[in-house]
């Protein structure tokens, strides 16, 4: 993968128009211990009036995401760990965006049981770049993965079909899914799941 750090920069650029509370780990700093600790600390600060977002770009495997120190037995951030962190977080809305191969298989770690059911406090949404058996493709020449390309474009207003300045979960899914599917010749299909309403607000893109 050539553009994972560029994916992070592109996503951060959108989010930073809304908040200064953005924490980034890339390259050798993105070890499992550092990633877990950072998520834990940030989530612990969140109040019931907040929304939290976790963005990941890199290699994935059925059941989790690969950190910098990933090996055959350790170094992966698992769905169980993410679910546990979400369960402890008081934020009203929790979202995961992942541009990673096989990321749609994340929920399979629970063998079909959706771990989001244990997260009772607030909405929880996973938006993942590909199905269980699919790789996540990058743009020829960059600068991003196809999922990040359309995710960022959608959050900047492209997904706002009714032009009310609010990007809902349904609008974002429809926009990104169509864009990625077409761009990859139907070889990649983003998936969205969790516990939330289709009308859940993901982002207000008209921030001044």
Describe each PLM feature range.
Residues 1-208:
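Cysteine endopeptidase catalytic domains of the caspase/legumain-like
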């Amino acid at each position: 993968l050539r553009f994972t750090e560029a994916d992070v920069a592109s996503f951060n650029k959108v989010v930073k128009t809304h908040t200064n509370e953005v924490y980034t780990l890339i390259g050798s700093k993105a070890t499992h211990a550092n990633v877990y600790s950072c998520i834990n600390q940030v989530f612990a600060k969140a109040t019931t009036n907040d929304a939290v977002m976790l963005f990941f770009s890199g290699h994935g495997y059925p059941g989790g995401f690969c950190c910098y120190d990933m090996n055959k037995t350790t170094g992966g951030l698992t769905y169980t760990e993410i679910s546990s962190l979400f369960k402890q977080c008081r934020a009203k809305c929790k979202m995961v965006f992942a541009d990673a191969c096989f990321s749609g298989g994340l929920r399979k770690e629970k063998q079909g049981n959706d771990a989001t059911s244990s997260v009772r406090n607030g909405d929880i949404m996973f938006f993942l770049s590909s199905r269980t058996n699919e790789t996540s493709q990058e743009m020829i020449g960059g600068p991003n993965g196809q999922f990040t390309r359309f995710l960022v474009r959608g959050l900047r207003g492209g997904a706002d079909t009714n032009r009310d300045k609010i990007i809902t979960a349904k609008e974002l899914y429809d926009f990104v899914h169509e864009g990625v599917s077409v761009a990859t010749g139907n070889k990649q299909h983003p998936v969205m799941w969790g516990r939330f309403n289709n009308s859940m607000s993901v982002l207000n893109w008209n921030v001044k």
